[in-house]
Every structure is written in C-alpha cells, then in structure tokens.
Amino acid sequence: MIIYDKPFKTYEQQIELLRTRNLNISNQEFAIHALDTISYYDLINRYQKHFIPDGEHFIEGTTIEQLYSLSMFDRSIQAFILKYSMFIENIFKTKLAYTLSRDFGVDMSVYLAKSKYKESYQNPNNVLTFDAVQLECFKTRNDDKIANNPTLYYREHHNHIPPWILLKNLSFSNSINLFKLLKNAQRDDVVNELLPNEPDRIIPLNDKTNFIICALEAIRVFRNAAAHNLDFTALRTDETRKIPSSTLSKCLPGKILIKKEKKKIEKNEKVYLKGVYGVMLSMMVLLKTDYLKKQFIVDFLSVFNGIDEGDREIRPFLFQCYANIADMPVDTRNRFLIYLEQT
C-alpha cells in the first residue's frame, strides 16, 4: 500500500499544521476563508522565500492575514500585467498584420506562402520551422474548435481571411513565431515600427530585433503565468532568453528606472530585469508614446491605493515583501514617481 507523502487534509487540519509551523492564526473562521478561496499552496508555498527562510517555520509574528493581503496584492499586480500584455499583443499584431497585408496582400494562400518566409529559425533550445507555424495558422482557420470570431465569421461570410483577421485568433506565441520567420525586409520593418530610432538614440538593427523577440517572449510567458495562476513571483527569464539590459537602458535613458554606476548597469539591476520588473520596463518601451507610458505608471501606482486607510497603510509593507520574493527594486514606486515628474 502506498503511503502518500502529500495526503488530503481538511481545512481544520491545514490550520493545525500551519500553527505547528509558527503561523499566527487567531481567527479560525478567517483562516478557513483564506484557505477556501486562495488555497494552501498559493497562500503558503508561493511566498515562503520571504516568510519561511529556513523552509520549515514562519518568521516570528507572521499572520495569516498578512499572507492573505499579500496574495491579493500579488493578484493586483498580475491583473496589471495581464492588462498591458494584451495591449502589447494587440500593438504587435497590428504592426505585423499591416506589414503582411502591405507587402504580400490579403489572400491567405499568398501571405502564408512558403516562399515569403525563412525555412527555419534557431531558438535557444530548438529549431522553429515555417511548416510547423504555417500548420498552426491553417488550424486556426479551419478547425471549428479553434477558429472563433472574427476568423470563423470571415470564413463563412467573406471570400478571404486577411492577416488582421487571422491574427486576432492566432495565439500570441504563434504570432511571435511567424514574425521570427519573416525574411529580413519584412521583419526589419516590423522591428523599426515597434522600436523606431530617435535623434538621440540610434540602436543597431540586430540589437533591436533581439530585444523585440526577447521582450515579446518574456511578456507572453509572464502573461500566461498570470492568466493560469502559476507561480508568477518565482518566474524569471533564463540566460538564453533574458531581456538585453543594455538595449533596454538605451530605450529608457537616465538613471531613474535602471540604476547605473560609472555608466555601467549595476549587478542588482540585472537581477531585477530578469523578473517582472524587466517585463514592466519592456512594456513601457513598446508602448512608445509618453502618454501611454504615463498611463502605464499611473495604473501600476494604483495598486498601492487600497480600499481604506488601514489597507493603504499596509501596502508599502506588502510591496517590500513582494519585492523580496519577485526580485523587484524596493524603491520601484519612487522610481516611477520620479520618472513621471521628469517626463
């Protein structure tokens, strides 16, 4: 007979276990509510880096109310990331669809013709082929379980499906893959539309292309983690897909959002850029206009507002915990406030 190492426990048993691990639980009813709505795993395991440094016992004085508040705070940041990831996805797909339509036309058999693309693209861990991506595009068009409005509507009521319609239903991942496989002329056009040079900022095309690919991939991965309730705070970009810090710094000049020492990006800053902070700064770059960047910052700062005075007072403490777990600068809020004042 198998003795399972993670057997089922009732909420009452979970509470007793947490008490033996030094978690302060004074309100049994609230504790059951917290475990019933958020779950033991999401409430405890997700934040143990900060609250359970030895892996066994909570820091003295830690309460279940603090964990619950931190979880809600975490979800506010995830909702913020979700909102802007969808915006970035739309910006990217709009640029991609425009280029495909202008250069190749609106007939799917033409703008998805193999001759228009590179045969393959070398990802860090595998080879991406055009045949595989083309197949995903056809699945989106043909399969009733995948095809939805507007693609399904166009399939049934029009004589073609233009790029701007297909891309509405093509996944973010497959849209990025299609972009990777574009020949240089079209890919360069999309890159320059997403990240145009400015009089005081000239970035080599290869560097811009690498940044766009890494930034879009990171935004997609963090968006998916938030959408599917995965361990968002533990997510980091690996070495093969990390957002290029030097290019990001050129796009956000000054020493406000990315700290430098003697014109070099500090070591801690590079750690921050592997997590959600790097994704946030990449989003700002892709938003392009000062208005959208300011709106982005205002929306982020709103997570500190709280529902009442007591909730607002605890927000700085919650963010300090969150920053420690997610590897964000503890002064993120101040950095954005200063950026707002100076732009």
What do the PLM-derived regions correspond to, one by one?
Residues 2-342:
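Long, contiguous internal "core" modules enriched in hydrophobic/ aromatic residues
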